[in-house]
């Protein structure tokens, strides 16, 4: 049953992302079920970022990385009297820190580079991400390529800084991903 859910998630990768925006919008507006932290996540940081952490690619990466943790570790922890939660907290999460950092970096980059999603849920210009701000700048000031390229260059600095500080864990997760244990 677990594999059926996983493969149906993988099948959803074939659906264009733009088509999934409408159901996401209905959820964020609070039309489908009540949300924590208020009736709607429109014009909020939660509405802008939370949908990117449920990305199917991120779920796929986490599953594949955690799946390669040897069963012998669970057997040894169970013999020591560890519960499922204790095993998750003390063994799985520390061993998975490289992939957790990697998927967090991917989620940040997805949210940072998003364009259509912020246009749908944000009305306040002070919440606009860089991509939408650059688009608004072009609409108001015209196409001045020197200013456009300067703004685009400035927009990549946070991603580069984040990658610089997480580079060791990022490369560790990539190098360990294909190894069979």
Task: Enumerate the language-model features and the residues they cover.
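A hydrophobic, multi-pass inner-membrane permease signature
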Residues: 1-181
